[in-house]
Amino acid sequence: MSRRRASRALLSATLLLAAAAGACGYSLRGNLPDHLKTVSVPVFRNRTTEAGAESTITAAVVNAFTSSGRLKVVSLEDADSVLDGEITGYQVQSLTYDSKLNLRSYRLTVTMNVRFRDLRRTEILWQQEGLVAEVSFDVAGQVSDTISREEGAVKQAALEIGRKIVGHAVDRF
């Protein structure tokens, strides 16, 4: 086959492949099953000693679903689907030190197991064990200021978890 024919054949094959891919219905929005319109997000179980983390993380996940606009958050009785889970890890570890070996920052790591279920068809649509969010925060002069920064880090980790969960549960279909 001549070089010119080979180029035309390659171009034709590429165009055919592109047209076929375009007809596959690929969308950046995802293809959540049509019958799913609502989701319930019960308060996550907290298997750690960090009191209150479950409320902060659950609220962030509810807000992430609400912001996405893909599923309306409702009570369990009215839901087509449910996102449930548990917080399995909450660790604060030393991260950086200054030249005098004074602690300068921490890393907060929150670990969860989550599951997204279709209640109408009684099937698990997505689940993940060991979903992790990590946030660093600086040490402040006063202990109370450092605690306040840790609380802010928990909120940031919760936002990250919310984005990850909605990304997996809704946008990856």
Protein language model regions, located:
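Surface-exposed short loop/turn segments
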Residues: L28, S67-L71, V82-Q128, V135-G152
